[in-house]
Amino acid sequence: IDVLCHALEGFWSKGHQPVCDALALHACKIVFRYLKTVYNNPQDKEARAKMAEASVIAGLAFTLPKTTSSHACSFPLTNLLHIPHGEACGLTLDYFARINADAQNGRVHEFAKELGFKDMYDMADAIHQLKTDIGLRTNLKEFNLTDEQVADLVRIRRHPNLYNYPIDI
């Protein structure tokens, strides 16, 4: 799911570039087609190769524009709570997709349409379902955090990657 985060965050980053946008779109197409297959059948060599391809392409998609909100939120989750990086990034991806859906003069909805979704809200629903289908937790309640852990997350909530997100958080 981290591959999908890399691609989407590179696309909607304030520093997005046309070539990176095209790479992000290509990587997302592969992820939506093959991630669930790899999860359900890890021995599927074609699907694994395609996900490796998507990983490289998504890496290129965010290299110039940088990652944004989902990665910013993931770092304290991983550092303090030891949640695996990809799951921590994916935890907020569909939420930020919804927050960002109407920003950037419609380009976010157009991106989702290029992937076959009605709009970014529809794509956010698909991301949520994909996370569920591959066994990832989908909200912080599922981590049974203590009050102290929540306070720690709030205390270190501002990561520089948030400044790459097109909406002030």
Predicted features, each with a name:
Residues I1-P65, P166:
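Carboxylate- and glycine-rich phosphate/diphosphate-binding segment that chelates Mg2+/Mn2+
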Residues D2, P18-K29, E87, D102, ...:
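Alpha-helix N-cap/helix-start motif at coil-to-helix transitions, marked by capping-box chemistry
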Residues L4-L8, M51-G59, C73, L93, ...:
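Short alpha-helical scaffolding segments that buttress acidic/His motifs in well-ordered protein cores
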Residues A7-G15, V38, A58-A61, L80, ...:
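Alpha-helix C-capping/helix-to-loop hinge sites
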Residues L23, A27, A47-K50, S69, ...:
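Residue-level detector of well-ordered alpha-helical segments, enriched
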Residues P65-M120, H128:
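C-terminal catalytic subdomain
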Residues V108-I169:
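C-terminal charged capping/lid subdomain of soluble metabolic enzymes
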